[in-house]
């Protein structure tokens, strides 16, 4: 089996690329970073530090790389069995024209073997969004052929990959946590389902998308916001602070109650999942900075994201939410000189006051009880 993976950054190499290579798939990375491309093509291998209770070093080998803006990537799309991405949500639109050209070439060459495309991004139904961009870039006479022969498969991904702190200055070395989860929507594949050991197939992807968003992402963000307010440097430092830990665990239990109501998750299994997430935040090898995890507070306070969406669920099912409120208040306090959204948030609160600002960012009713609760909590933190 041959695969092309867009994005040779830390997540591409340390997560999806590694899982594909470990499965014995012939893997080519596509990227714009010439230093990384040259290193991959010189060595055809790289090292991944996998850290948890212990640390081990795995070598990923037999890999190649091409520029994501040249003809090589178009040629590969015409030939491979699988295309994956880890480029970040904003970049999906930029790689769509190259994918479209490759699909046209595939059609022209008469290659009717199924191709499946999986965007592995930290977003909901990212592949469906990528499909929209690809379809817009396709000529009309290719669209029906693509619908017939190409599967656009949504996925949910979870692995903490902190920014590289390589002591060797090796552009390819990467550190990842032991935990990884790659769940894909098996209803969207064309042809036979692939046999990739680390890929989990489901016919209810949204349950797992929301489980991750409401637990890992919610907990990570609240740990960062409360940790920064308390003067902690890393996620580990913050989660070892008993006061912060109690709020983070409480918030994940509140959002978990929504998931259990909505999707029928087993309560004991979900409690164990929460404990596993807390353990991941404690990982001493992941020097994950609270400022990095907290950045983009406007996005994280928006209606469909990790703080407001679970809160809306608690309102829908009349469930408690006092810890989620603490997290939202903490997010409103987030300040960072390096983050434009943090500066915009501060300006908005200074201009409109916390009540109107939160309502504008989150879509919540300014006169609602929850906004009032969040503003009270926000003021109590000053």
UniProtKB/Swiss-Prot annotation:
Its EC number is 1.1.1.17. It is an enzyme of class 1 (oxidoreductase). GO terms for biological process: mannitol catabolic process. The modification N6-acetyllysine is found at residue 269. GO terms for molecular function: mannitol-1-phosphate 5-dehydrogenase activity. One of its GO terms (cellular component) is cytosol. Transmembrane segments: none annotated. NAD(+) binds at residues 3-14. The keyword Ligase does not apply. Pfam families: Mannitol_dh (PF01232), Mannitol_dh_C (PF08125). It comes from the Bacteria. It catalyses: D-mannitol 1-phosphate + NAD(+) = beta-D-fructose 6-phosphate + NADH + H(+). Keywords: Acetylation, NAD, Oxidoreductase. Belongs to the mannitol dehydrogenase family. This is Mannitol-1-phosphate 5-dehydrogenase. It comes from Shigella boydii serotype 18 (strain CDC 3083-94 / BS512).
